[in-house]
Amino acid sequence: MLDFYYLPGSAPCRAVQMVAEAVHVKLNLKYLDLMAGAHRSPQFTKLNPQRTIPTLVDGSLILSESRAALIYLCDQYGDEDNDWYPRDTIQRAIVNQRLFFDACVLYPRFADFYHPQVFGNAAPDGRKRLAFEKAVELLNIFLSEHEFVAGSKMTIADISLFATLATACTLGFILRPYVHVDRWYVTMVASCPGAQANVSGAKEFLTYK
């Protein structure tokens, strides 16, 4: 069983949990209370000098970036022909691009807009909201031609993006104007492994201060 240091309110943590469920990997859940400073303990700092979650431990392997963990879980534990992270080079490249879109565009813009409000009681910043909205508009374009973000089948890229948007929706972001994203989100809630835990975990984010 793999050790998994996490917080339920963390979107990247929930993405790892959903993919683990998809490939039938059991995680030994280790709740890490960041608000209490548990990530700064000597024990955790030795394990992960970045002091970040999620942190996935499989024997001597320690992964502290969620999307790297998603890829590893599929490569190491997924079936040879699993669709979560396809073996075909071109299909995999598209999945990677969508994963990096979440890592480098959507999630950072989400955090830039919402984190100051949640953790610092800041007033909403209009420019930051516009930047996040533009990222969702791009996702809407990606979803305009296919059912899922990288083609006709759900992949780890969908799961990573689903985790990010679940938190945004919990914080009041409305997907209805983005018709393709809205349609996709409904599908993810209905059919993604671990979807209900993702949605309920997103609600816990509201309690973090």
From Swiss-Prot:
PROSITE patterns: GST_CTER, GST_NTER. InterPro entries: Glutathione-S-Trfase_C-like, Glutathione-S-Trfase_C_sf, Glutathione_S-Trfase, Glutathione_S-Trfase_N, GST_C, Thioredoxin-like_sf. Pfam families: GST_C, GST_N_3. Residues 88-209 form the GST C-terminal domain. Conjugation of reduced glutathione to a wide number of exogenous and endogenous hydrophobic electrophiles. Belongs to the GST superfamily. Theta family. It comes from Anopheles gambiae (African malaria mosquito). This is Glutathione S-transferase 2.
